[in-house]
Amino acid sequence: MTIPLLEINSLSFSYKVNLPPVFNNLSLKIEQGELIGLLGENPAGKTTLFNLIRGGVSNYEGTLKRNFSGGELVSLPQVINLSGTLRNEEVLDLICCFNKLTKKQAWTDVNHKWNDNFFIRYDKIRRKRTYTVSYGEKRWLIISLMVTLCKNARLFLLDEPTVGIDIQYRMMLWELINKITADGKTVFFSTHIFDELTRDKIPFYMLSKNSINRYSDMSDFIQSNNETTQKRHLLKKLWEQETDTWI
């Protein structure tokens, strides 16, 4: 029996004693090599859960077992800040530096993972300063380089990875993520974009009412809740969560 990469049991957390809990008796398990989503409306606690996983929050009840070292975790926050004076190709240099890679080693990995469309896209922006390209372009570049070059990582935590990224480049990014999970990497990503969980049979956790439920895919999500259309059911779940915050 394999040991889960991440295991959380009966976790409860509140930012302050007199505030309602963000999580109440939350449990989840993530295995090595999984691509798994985290669905929930803003602010359902997706970012807070990621902060807990990476050790940014410690005042919780319950158990959180990380069966990986700090160097085996790569986390992408929702907001990315880069110096505007950097050229986009220098982002590659920074990631090489953090991962102790030579440019030759990096390009070997990039050539192995990227298809022609990636190189066409990269060539268009690589000499530009980061302030001259869109937020989505910067995000696409950083994620593409991170998942390609962070070879020691076992778990990637991606908080809303495709926010601001055009649909065609979003699809390229998911193809790349599928490649690294096929190689045994684990990707746990948060999203509130419905379609990102319907294009493939992607398992996901649903955050609702301060707790969490796991579904094997969107069909399981529908069948478990006796609904006939995906969007109607999702809206019902998120509506329950939203109205509870108003009471």
Swiss-Prot record:
- Does the keyword Transport feature in the UniProt annotation? yes
Its keywords, alphabetically, are: Antibiotic resistance, ATP-binding, Nucleotide-binding, Plasmid, Transport
Superkingdom of source: Bacteria
Which BP terms in the Gene Ontology apply to this protein?
Answer: response to antibiotic
Q: Which residues form a coiled coil?
A: none
Q: Where does ATP bind?
A: G40, E41, N42, P43, A44, G45, K46, T47
Segments forming domain ABC transporter: 6-234
**What are this entry's molecular-function GO terms?**
ATP binding; ATP hydrolysis activity
Summarizing the function annotation, the protein's role is: Together with two further proteins McbE and McbG this protein causes immunity to the peptide antibiotic microcin B17, which inhibits DNA replication in enterobacteriaceae. Immunity is determined by two different mechanisms. McbE is involved in the production of extracellular MccB17 and, in a complex with mcbf it also serves as 'pump' for the export of active MccB17 from the cytoplasm to the periplasmic space.
* Protein family: Belongs to the ABC transporter superfamily.
| Protein name in the entry | Protein McbF
Q: Which organism is it from?
A: Escherichia coli
